[in-house]
Amino acid sequence: KPHWVLHPATDAERTVAACMDVPAIRELFMPAETAIVMKEQRIEAIDGNVWISGVIDRLVIDGNSACIVDFKTDHADTAEQLRERHEAQLQAYARIVSKITRIPCDRIRLMIISTHLKTVIQV
């Protein structure tokens, strides 16, 4: 495990470290050696006629595919509630990443890690 998981220094690191025992979550932190991993990637762009300003928590680009991972601390009862609540945001991020990288949207996976439910939710 990474050093920060074994010895978390911040509240955010403690929250994520507590989720790392879940295999599906841990897998998202083990990209291929060829992958480019960006953390807390700030984006500002116009999507259609809407200004989008946000931070992609984790963006993994590997060849002609990508994965956007967004951590959510919402206290939702179900994964479906979180998916519905955040789907539009992640889809907007995917469109922006697609424009920047030229990776088609259908090759960009959208994942939510719920720190409350300790699960991965595919959007």
Question: Would you name each region that the model predicts?
Answer:
Residues K1-I46, T119:
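A non-catalytic, helix-rich entry segment at domain boundaries
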Residues N49-V123:
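Mg2+/Mn2+-dependent nuclease catalytic core
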